[in-house]
């Protein structure tokens, strides 16, 4: 993708540069007449913690990469509140999967 010219007008604004957001932006960008803005709250996924599967445990719970959601306590599981990882990086949760397919 190219860096767009300075503009305050957008045809499409996509919130979240996860897998779906990036694919959508790419497809829309095939029409050179459209101004598209892709917004991501997190960082680029260039960290070795993301690139090396053995370091993947260092990503979960790390506020730089993970939104650190916590589920409501579950009565069927002794009211335990489980952590629910969600990617806060370019690539979204796909960047946190430890390259497991």
Regions found by a protein language model. Give the residues of each.
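N-terminal redox-cofactor-binding region of secreted/periplasmic oxidoreductases
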Residues: 1-101
């Amino acid at each position: 993708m190219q860096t767009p010219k300075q503009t305050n007008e957008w045809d499409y604004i996509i919130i979240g540069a996860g897998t779906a957001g990036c694919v959508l932006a790419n497809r829309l960008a095939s029409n050179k007449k459209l101004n598209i803005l892709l917004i991501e709250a997190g960082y680029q996924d260039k960290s070795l913690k993301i690139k090396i599967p053995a370091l993947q445990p260092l990503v979960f719970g790390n506020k730089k990469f993970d939104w650190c959601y916590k589920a409501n306590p579950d009565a069927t599981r002794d009211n335990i509140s489980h952590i629910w990882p969600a990617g806060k990086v370019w690539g979204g949760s796909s960047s946190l999967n430890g390259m497991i397919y």
